[in-house]
Amino acid sequence: MKIVLASNNRGKLAELRAMLAPLGFELITQGELGIPEAPEPYHTFVENALAKARHASAHSGLPALADDAGLCVDAFGGLPGVQTAFYATRFGYEKGDDNNVRALLEQMRDVDNRRAALVSTLVAVRSEQDPEPLIAVGRVVGEIARAPVGSHGFGFDPVMLIPEFGQTFAQLPVEVKNANSHRGRAARAMLALMRERWL
């Protein structure tokens, strides 16, 4: 079965392809089908993910999977949250992973409470009008490191220090990261839901 990923993010595509491989789904990006990105006007991950999944399904006629994910920093009241991808732009930088990390470290320079969570919300729909979307959430709590460490992953992986490993996500082998990441946890829950309700 073909499923459209409501994203053009290559990092997300690679992770989700690997995680959904056991079901035999062919995951293709919306960009491959010429589908524009959906607006994300909401304040919660689940609302944005649902809007993106419905948008991709409406434009493709195929089932769709969307991920809305972000970093929620305790010292910032849970922000940047759904605005994570654009975090750097608030501080005069261009949008991008490296700039997001740079801006975060600058804003947290004198902050002692470094607790943060990476959150991934996956939503899958069979069609644009699917009355029963599948919703899976994964969450990992860690601490923001004082400097980037590691060369794997993307996003905030180089500064997301995971206490049980004593390393950032970017230092962990890909298999270990995927098994323990917010997206990995959400994908495992989504796999179970898809097996139960779609297969």
UniProtKB/Swiss-Prot annotation:
Protein family: Belongs to the HAM1 NTPase family.
NCBIfam families, sorted: RdgB/HAM1 family non-canonical purine NTP pyrophosphatase
One MF annotation (Gene Ontology) recorded for this entry: nucleotide binding
GO biological process, one term: purine nucleoside triphosphate catabolic process
Keywords recorded for this protein, A-Z: Hydrolase, Magnesium, Metal-binding, Nucleotide metabolism, Nucleotide-binding
Enzyme class: hydrolase
Superkingdom of source: Bacteria
Catalytic activity: XTP + H2O = XMP + diphosphate + H(+); dITP + H2O = dIMP + diphosphate + H(+); ITP + H2O = IMP + diphosphate + H(+)
Cofactor entry: Mg(2+)
Annotated positions binding Mg(2+): 68
Entry protein name: dITP/XTP pyrophosphatase
Record-linked InterPro entries: dITP/XTP_pyrophosphatase, ITPase-like_fam, RdgB/HAM1
GO CC aspect terms: cytosol
